[in-house]
Amino acid sequence: MQPTFYVRAKWDEEAGVWYTAETSIRGLVTEAETLEKLRERLMLIIPDFLEEQMPERAVLHILAESADELIREAAE
């Protein structure tokens, strides 16, 4: 079975970026303008970040979290 790395990504409304809020890889921090760009960045930097500790193959599991305010329009 392949090892799995977990990343919880959150949306920062003020900065306009997705960032790594929690991860199973200690010290891994990054951000990107879109969730897809964050995924691409993680796929590139994780092997370099882990160096010799990186297994030959692994699974990257990203849980994305964002919150939006819902406003009910007044009935006419």
Regions found by a protein language model. Name each.
Residues M1-R8, E14-A15, E36-E76:
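Short, charged, surface-exposed hinge/linker loops at domain edges
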Residues K10-I25:
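Short aromatic-glycine-(Arg/Gly/Cys) micro-motifs in beta-strand/loop hairpins
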Residues R26-K37:
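A short, exposed loop/beta-hairpin motif centered on an aromatic-Gly-Thr core
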